[in-house]
Structures are given as structure tokens and as C-alpha cells.
A protein has these predicted regions:
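C-terminal edge-of-domain segments
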Residues: 35-168
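Short, structured beta-strand-loop surface elements
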Residues: 1-33, 37-40, 47, 132
Length: 168
């Protein structure tokens, strides 16, 4: 194992928070049919610390608070479902450009288009045909206006690149 790896330790806490449930289901559509079963429950992990192996001789323990986003992300979190709905309904081309030109992923067939499944201060999550991807932001975004500006910036950057090019 030459690559770095991290193990997150924490408390699993049952949750009924509708936003957390919708975030999970956006990423795991196949679970939606089971979500209303009486024996199906949702949990969140409250990190207490993490064990990082960053390479040979580079092993560290990290406190849980250092794993969490700094700053108030309530505004972005409250708007996440609307941002996802808007991007997926109106900006499918931009999502494909993010995946193909910024992340270097293969084009997907029209029957399985890229869709945004999440957004948080550090980046956005994409999914298409069972393939998932993460596109990080250069700077944290904490509210819908900052998210919009970053999504527009990324779309312009992606459009400026030739298909298959690495240059910015």
C-alpha cells in the first residue's frame, strides 16, 4: 500500500434529520425504495479522531474537529436540494464538462447522464451510471451565492479546455 489512507473513528448516531436523509438518498438512489421500511434507519458518524497513514513513517492521529468544515455552512446546506435540482434540470452540459474536462472521466451515454448528487463547502459530487466522482473547489464556499459563482467559474474553465487537454 504505497498510497496514503485514513481511518475515521467516531460515534454512529441514529438520525431522522430530513436534510441528512435526502443527502444520503441523493447519492444512493437505489436505497430510496427501502427508506420507508420500519427496519431501515439512517445514521451519521460524529468523528472523534482519525488515523492517517500518509506514507512510510508518516503516521498521525488527527482530532475529529480538524476533519470538519470551518465556518457556518447552514446557508449552503439549506439550499443544497434546490442547487442540485437546478443543476440537474438545467445544466446537464456543465455537469458533463466538469466530469470530462476537469476530472478527465469518460463521456457517458445520453441514457446515463452525469448528475450532481451533493455540494458542500469543499466541492461537489457527481454520479452517472454507477460511476461517482468528486470535484473539489479552490476555495471553500459557504452560501448559495458563493456556490453559484464557483459553479459558473468551473463551467467557464471546463469550456475553455479542449476535450482531453490538461492545460488551464
Amino acid at each position: 500500500m504505497a498510497r496514503g489512507r485514513v481511518t475515521v473513528l467516531g460515534r454512529a448516531e441514529r438520525t431522522g434529520d430530513k436534510r441528512q436523509i435526502e443527502r444520503f438518498l441523493a447519492r444512493h438512489e437505489e436505497a430510496r425504495g427501502y427508506a420507508t421500511f420500519k427496519d431501515f434507519h439512517f445514521y451519521r458518524v460524529a468523528p472523534t479522531r482519525a488515523h492517517l497513514v500518509a506514507g512510510f513513517g508518516r503516521i498521525h492521529w488527527i482530532e475529529g474537529g480538524a476533519l470538519l468544515c470551518r465556518g457556518n455552512m447552514d446557508a449552503l446546506s439549506n439550499a443544497e436540494s434546490e442547487i442540485l435540482a437546478h443543476m440537474n434540470a438545467d445544466h446537464g452540459e456543465a455537469l458533463a464538462l466538469y466530469a470530462e474536462r476537469l476530472l478527465g472521466l469518460a463521456p457517458m451515454p445520453d441514457s446515463k447522464p452525469w448528475r450532481m448528487t451533493g455540494i458542500d463547502p469543499e466541492g461537489l459530487d457527481l454520479e452517472a451510471g454507477g460511476v461517482t466522482a468528486r470535484l473539489g473547489f479552490d476555495q471553500p464556499v459557504l452560501d448559495p451565492d458563493a456556490a453559484r459563482a464557483e459553479l459558473v467559474r468551473l463551467a467557464k474553465l471546463a469550456r475553455s479546455r479542449q476535450a482531453g487537454s490538461d492545460s488551464e
